[in-house]
């Protein structure tokens, strides 16, 4: 009960509670820096090997994630380019060529298709002569 509220109030009380018992000699030195680097100080004082490894370790996946995130917008851009370039090309083709293709089952059942002009199948009366 006592640990929760001080932790939520600010970082000054946990360093004062945690630093004097383990490093008594260096406690006063950390006292001045405690409010700023208290949580980090614990990690460095606790195990010196842990803070360096999570840094690069987390950096690697995050960087990989950033690369993937950068690639995904490129893919989205490429899809947007495809979407932007296909409708003008398909515009004339939609009215002419789609009549040779099978009838769109969604258009046949519902009378409409969510892909509309982008659909690869034949929409009678929409992208070709009615049946």
Curated annotation (Swiss-Prot):
Pfam families: zf-CCCH
Keyword Methyltransferase: no
Zinc fingers typed C3H1-type, residue spans: 98-126
SMART domains, sorted: ZnF_C3H1
Keyword Aminoacyl-tRNA synthetase: no
Keywords, in A-Z order: Metal-binding, Zinc, Zinc-finger
SUPFAM superfamilies listed in its UniProt record: CCCH zinc finger
InterPro entries, sorted: PRR3, Znf_CCCH, Znf_CCCH_sf
Ranges for region Disordered: 1-77
Cystine connections: none
Matches recorded under Gene3D superfamilies: Zinc finger, CCCH-type (4.10.1000.10)
Gene Ontology MF terms: zinc ion binding
PROSITE patterns associated with the record: ZF_C3H1 (PS50103)
Record's compositionally biased regions (Gly residues): 28-44
Feature: compositional bias, Pro residues: 12-25
PANTHER family documented for this protein: PROLINE-RICH PROTEIN 3, PROLINE-RICH PROTEIN 3-RELATED
UniProt-recorded name of the protein: Proline-rich protein 3
């Amino acid at each position: 009960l006592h640990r929760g509220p001080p932790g939520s109030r600010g970082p000054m009380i946990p360093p004062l509670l945690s630093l004097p018992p383990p490093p008594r000699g260096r406690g006063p030195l950390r006292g001045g820096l405690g409010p700023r680097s208290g949580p980090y100080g614990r990690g460095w004082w606790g195990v010196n090997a842990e803070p360096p490894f999570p840094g690069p370790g987390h950096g690697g996946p995050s960087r990989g994630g950033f690369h993937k995130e950068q690639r995904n917008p490129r893919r989205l851009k490429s899809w947007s380019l495809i979407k932007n370039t296909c409708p003008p090309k398909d515009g004339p083709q939609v009215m002419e060529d789609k009549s040779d293709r099978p009838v769109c089952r969604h258009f046949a059942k519902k009378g409409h298709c969510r892909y509309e002009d982008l659909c690869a199948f034949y929409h009678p009366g929409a992208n070709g002569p009615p049946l």
